[in-house]
């Protein structure tokens, strides 16, 4: 009997339709970097609230310097000194200037700032009581940052859904926000299945292997914006698996297992989901990662990945990562895809869509993007995944690609929404 394999796009749609953004939490603005705002951020005051100097120098009336030149310099009286955080309480009149520091408010009457380096100090230290000479005119607004140059009070400085950059945290602080609301990091329960598995710090006996998938999946979960919770290794025992899965479902927003997703005698996980929840699919037309179960347990999304490291990695990238990003409120949930030129031939005999580990680089001479497959696509090898920066996507159907053919690559080294 032929296996029922669903297309990857259908599987992705099913997964995304069964997850929703998490509840809102309020966090410090600096912790919001990298995540989308849940609500519009509105400035409570003008940013900047006053016109200020863009550099150290002298605040002047440009009208006083209209005739200034090297042959006929203009001398002004220094009537005060103003640093950032200090306000000169007077006003500048004809023939007067104020020594000013970067960021300080431009005094009343002044409409320009002349940088310190091109002003000649005739006597004193250049501060109040000194006389200074100018040898060139100053333009209105020269070296002056206007009030409300960034935003007016009441303006939206960052829209809901916009991802906060590190500089954006500063913008939010300028707008009066010490904290902002974002969608909470979903808790993702991770369970490794298999009697043959031992913890990474243990020396495996004959027939045993170290559990590498849990470390990789926790790192991938954290990178996607979620909080990984590891529930340990479950042996090939229905009761042990059920106990861990039940606990994870109760405590987490999303549950992921690796191992126990194929048709082996000891693969109990799909049977558990069928018995206690709902299986929405259990095979995908994809390599690696054909044997993937997705369903609902206790109303929570459940994803059963293959125990093969490469299959688990690709399954996470294609299904779990987009789901986690949706739960965090991101509008962009898919990795960027770009075209590159193959450096070698690739032959595919199977119908399934392939995602081969590869590296894409730009030719330094021509600027052309070139993609080279890893030498081996063995699904048990982790080094090729560590060193790959893309997945070479080869769509359904047998094919034979030649060096020089243009192909699609999924950039796993770039964040979603990257413009290429």
Give the ranges of each region predicted by the language model.
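Generic structural signal for well-ordered, non-membrane alpha-helical segments
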Residues: 4, 8-12, 25, 29, ...
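Helix-rich terminal scaffold detector
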Residues: 1-8, 178-305, 309-315
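Short, glycine/charged-enriched hinge/interface segments at domain edges or termini
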Residues: 2-3, 8-9, 59-235, 370, ...
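Flexible glycine/proline-rich
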Residues: 25-30, 39, 85, 106, ...
């Amino acid at each position: 009997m032929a296996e029922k394999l669903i297309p990857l796009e259908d599987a992705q749609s099913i997964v995304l339709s069964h997850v929703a953004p998490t509840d809102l939490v309020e966090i410090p603005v600096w912790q919001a970097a990298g995540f989308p705002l849940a609500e519009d951020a509105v400035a409570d005051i003008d940013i900047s609230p006053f016109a200020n100097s863009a550099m150290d120098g002298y605040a002047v009336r440009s009208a006083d310097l209209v005739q200034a030149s090297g042959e006929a310099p203009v001398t002004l009286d220094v009537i005060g000194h103003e640093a950032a955080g200090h306000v000169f309480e007077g006003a500048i009149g004809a023939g007067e200037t104020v020594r000013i520091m970067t960021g300080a408010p431009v005094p009343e009457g002044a409409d320009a700032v002349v940088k310190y380096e091109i002003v000649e100090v005739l006597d004193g230290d250049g501060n109040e009581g000194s006389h200074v000479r100018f040898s060139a005119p100053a333009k209105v607004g020269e070296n002056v940052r206007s009030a409300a140059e960034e935003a007016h009070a009441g303006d939206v400085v960052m829209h809901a859904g916009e991802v906060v950059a590190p500089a954006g945290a500063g913008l939010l602080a300028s707008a009066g926000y010490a904290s902002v609301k974002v969608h909470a990091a979903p808790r993702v329960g991770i369970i490794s299945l298999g009697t043959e598995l031992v913890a990474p710090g243990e020396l495996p006996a004959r027939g045993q292997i170290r559990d590498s998938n849990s470390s990789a999946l926790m790192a991938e979960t954290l990178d996607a914006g979620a909080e990984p919770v590891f529930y340990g290794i479950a042996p090939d025992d229905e009761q042990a698996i059920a106990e861990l899965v039940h606990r994870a479902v109760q405590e987490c927003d999303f549950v992921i297992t690796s191992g126990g997703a194929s048709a082996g005698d000891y693969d109990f996980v799909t049977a558990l989901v069928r018995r206690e929840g709902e299986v929405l699919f259990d095979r995908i037309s994809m390599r690696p990662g054909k044997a993937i179960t997705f369903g609902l347990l206790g109303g929570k999304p459940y994803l059963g990945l293959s125990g093969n490291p490469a299959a688990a990695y690709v399954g996470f990238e294609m299904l779990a990562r987009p789901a986690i990003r949706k739960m965090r409120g991101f509008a962009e949930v898919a990795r960027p895809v770009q075209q590159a030129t193959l450096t070698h031939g690739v032959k595919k005999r199977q119908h399934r869509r392939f995602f081969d580990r590869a590296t894409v680089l730009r030719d330094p001479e021509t600027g052309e993007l070139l993609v080279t497959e890893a030498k081996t696509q063995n699904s048990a090898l982790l080094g090729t995944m560590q060193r790959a920066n893309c997945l070479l996507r080869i769509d359904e159907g047998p094919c034979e690609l030649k060096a020089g053919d243009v192909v699609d690559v999924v950039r796993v080294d770039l964040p979603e929404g990257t413009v290429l």
